Design a protein with these regions (language model features):
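Basic helix-turn-helix/winged-helix DNA-binding cores
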Residues: 2-112
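Intrinsically disordered, low-complexity, charge-dense segments enriched in Lys/Arg
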Residues: 108, 112-223, 227-232
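Extended hydrophobic/Leu-rich segments
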Residues: 1-3, 8-16, 155-159, 166, ...
């Protein structure tokens, strides 16, 4: 990588660290209409857009999220702060996960913590995740700069400087992409494991399983009686 490419990476990292995010305290405590929701999201996440005309959130997106059971429906056409939290989760997750995987993650979250008496409250969950992600963001420059240094050690025997610069840039993109690919696989495996365990626990027990549980309970009761007698 030439000096210009290195400077670009440095500038990009500084920009990423300073990007706007939806802080827990930024979310309004009043309910919003759909137009107000899209405006709010666009104002707070505009720095993340790749292109100027990219849309952070549209009415169609919100309606589709509701139809696909990612987002609970509004109440009298108004969206609460809990809706904003869920929409923010969707915004980040949709860049790496399928709609079905996001649904598997968000459904348990919204069922238990969306406008319920569940503990912790959804705003507490959002705040804790936000605080952890801030720490991850602080560690990002060191990780990317490390991969940048590795890419600069590649293709050193290429004499043409323009070709060398491209190949080293390609190396950096591959290193970063491999990192994302591996983490995406880990995420999908975690979701699959959770889904399988939940399906197993939700499945009605067979007569044999019920009998086995009763037998084990009787054995445990006998063991408890023996232990009590021995103490006497």
């Amino acid at each position: 990588m030439n000096k210009n490419s290195q400077e670009f990476v440095d500038v990009l990292l500084k920009k990423l660290v300073k990007l706007n995010y939806i802080k827990p305290g930024d979310v309004p405590n009043i309910d919003l209409y759909m137009d107000q929701v899209t405006t709010f999201m666009d104002e707070h996440l505009s720095d993340i857009k790749r292109h100027e005309d990219d849309k952070i959130l549209t009415k169609t997106m919100i309606n589709n999220y509701t139809k696909n059971n990612l987002l609970p429906p509004p109440v009298k056409k108004k969206y609460s702060k809990e809706h904003i939290y869920v929409l923010t989760f969707i915004y980040y997750l949709k860049n790496i996960l399928s709609i079905s995987d996001i649904q598997k993650l968000l459904n348990p979250l919204t069922d238990k913590y969306f406008n319920t008496e569940g503990v912790p409250a959804l705003d507490t969950i959002y705040k804790e995740i936000y605080d952890m992600e801030k720490l991850q963001l602080e560690a990002l420059p060191q990780d990317v700069l490390g991969k940048t240094e590795l890419s600069k050690q590649a293709f050193c025997d290429v004499e043409n400087e323009e070709d060398k610069d491209f190949l080293q840039l390609f190396m950096l993109v591959c290193l970063l992409s491999f990192d994302v690919y591996m983490k995406k696989n880990i995420i999908e495996s975690l979701i699959d494991d959770y889904t399988a365990k939940k399906a197993s626990s939700d499945k009605p027990k067979t007569k044999e399983e019920i009998k086995e549980e009763k037998r084990e309970a009787k054995e445990e009761a006998k063991e408890a009686k023996r232990a009590a007698k021995q103490k006497k």
